[in-house]
């Protein structure tokens, strides 16, 4: 079964406000609410709190904006499951993986804000296995009940630790911000030999030069990093060979409401999604 999650919220908000999403969270909540509803209307069963960039290494008063992003999703918990975004402390693709006191305190404070207000923790794009291991430990010290999903970049560094990721106390292991062909090849090479079919598997599609954007760290130019989509024609062979009962597909940078709607319709037309999974 294929289940859908939302697409890139920052990518959508950035079309209107060229910041990290903090202006919309504080001054235009309706824009965010409408985007969430659009994803749900498409057929998405999971949405994600929009706090990926709300952290002390990015903005002041990060916790204020996290609280506001949490408040916005609460009414939707009657309609779908909410992923609580647990962002990377260090910039993506950086080589810094030091577990400092500031690192620990950020995650302690963040998890205390998320606890009880989300359905699943989504640990996104940390730069190393060491960081993910520490984040999961902090979560479990504070909240021993709510499931954890880890979402990693499909890069060389993470390829060395797929088995170790599966040994963490997590509910699922996803791949983040990746073209379909790259995801498929990475899965076959690194996931498949050690996969735990009891865990949830998923991935985020993208239409962006993710590494170039991440290295630039210029959110005001996010839209300029979008690339032309490549038509995919080999979904069927990949999905039919997966050992999982459920696969979650979402969108990341360059992959918003329009792109998710197109993907859902395409997979439905290919017979890969049952009609009752969609609105």
Predicted features and spans:
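Domain-level signal for soluble alpha/beta catalytic cores
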Residues: 1-279
């Amino acid at each position: 079964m294929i289940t859908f999650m939302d697409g890139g919220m920052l990518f959508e908000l950035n079309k209107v406000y060229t910041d990290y999403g903090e202006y919309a969270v504080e001054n235009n909540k309706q824009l965010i609410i409408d985007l969430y509803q659009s994803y749900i209307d498409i057929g998405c069963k999971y949405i994600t709190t929009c706090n990926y960039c709300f952290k002390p290494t990015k903005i002041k008063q990060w916790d204020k904006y996290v609280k506001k992003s949490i408040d916005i999703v609460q009414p939707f918990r009657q309609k779908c499951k909410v992923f609580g975004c647990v962002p990377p402390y260090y910039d993506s693709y950086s080589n810094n993986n030091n577990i400092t006191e500031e690192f620990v305190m950020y995650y302690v404070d963040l998890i205390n804000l998320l606890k009880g207000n989300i359905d699943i923790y989504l640990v996104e794009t940390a730069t190393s296995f060491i960081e993910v291991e520490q984040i999961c430990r902090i979560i479990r010290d504070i909240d021993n009940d709510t499931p954890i999903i880890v979402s990693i970049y499909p890069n060389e560094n993470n390829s060395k630790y797929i088995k170790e990721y599966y040994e963490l106390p997590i509910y699922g292991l996803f791949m983040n911000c990746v073209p379909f062909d790259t995801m498929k090849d990475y899965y076959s090479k690194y996931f498949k030999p050690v996969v735990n079919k009891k865990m949830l598997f998923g991935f985020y599609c993208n239409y962006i030069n993710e590494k170039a954007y991440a290295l630039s760290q210029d959110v005001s130019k996010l839209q300029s990093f979008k690339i032309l989509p490549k038509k995919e024609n080999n979904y069927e062979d990949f999905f039919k060979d997966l050992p999982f009962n459920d696969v979650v597909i979402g969108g990341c940078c360059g992959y918003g409401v329009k792109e998710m709607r197109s993907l859902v319709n395409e997979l439905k037309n290919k017979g890969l999604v049952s009609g009752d999974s969609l609105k």
